[in-house]
Amino acid sequence: MFLLYEYDIFWAFLIISSVIPILAFXISGILAPISKGPEKLSSYESGIEPMGDAWLQFRIRYYMFALVFVVFDVETVFLYPWAMSFDVLGVSVFIEALIFVLILIVGLVYAWRKGALEWS
């Protein structure tokens, strides 16, 4: 029989971790002074007054480069636990990891041919 009381700790953690940020935002919204003006609306960078337009538009190349970086960063996160327990796991897990890396290599070759890694 499925017992719901086994998950009481999970639900308590979920509720508490949801209430704390909501409560923090609500309290800061109530206690914060309301002051709008040109000083508050200007962008702040290292204590220096912004010169010219503060909003710069990044080229789409930057986003593609960042996306490829994130994909391979996540790959490292997935492969690290596998590498730490490599001697305990069997050959089937090695083959699965090999397939995972091969799929990522195919994705890298695709991004390379599309020019996502070209910065100029």
UniProtKB/Swiss-Prot annotation:
Keyword list, A-Z: Chloroplast, Membrane, NAD, NADP, Plastid, Plastoquinone, Quinone, Thylakoid, Translocase, Transmembrane, Transmembrane helix, Transport
Entry's Gene Ontology molecular function annotations: NADH dehydrogenase (ubiquinone) activity; quinone binding
Coiled coil stretches, renumbered: none
Entries under Gene3D superfamilies matching the protein: NADH:ubiquinone/plastoquinone oxidoreductase, chain 3
Reactions catalysed according to its record: a plastoquinone + NADH + (n+1) H(+)(in) = a plastoquinol + NAD(+) + n H(+)(out); a plastoquinone + NADPH + (n+1) H(+)(in) = a plastoquinol + NADP(+) + n H(+)(out)
Record field: transmembrane: 9-29, 64-84, 88-108
Enzyme class per UniProt: translocase
GO-annotated cellular components: chloroplast thylakoid membrane; NADH dehydrogenase complex
Annotated compartments: Plastid, Chloroplast thylakoid membrane
Main location: plastid
One BP annotation, GO: photosynthesis, light reaction
Topology in the lipid bilayer: Multi-pass membrane protein
EC id: 7.1.1.-
UniProt-listed InterPro entries: NAD(P)H_OxRDtase_bac/plastid, NADH_UbQ/plastoQ_OxRdtase_su3, NDAH_ubi_oxred_su3_sf
Domain of life (superkingdom): Eukaryota
HAMAP family, per the entry: NDH1_NuoA
Assembly, per entry: NDH is composed of at least 16 different subunits, 5 of which are encoded in the nucleus.
Family label: Belongs to the complex I subunit 3 family.
Function of the molecule: NDH shuttles electrons from NAD(P)H:plastoquinone, via FMN and iron-sulfur (Fe-S) centers, to quinones in the photosynthetic chain and possibly in a chloroplast respiratory chain. The immediate electron acceptor for the enzyme in this species is believed to be plastoquinone. Couples the redox reaction to proton translocation, and thus conserves the redox energy in a proton gradient.
Protein known as: NAD(P)H-quinone oxidoreductase subunit 3, chloroplastic
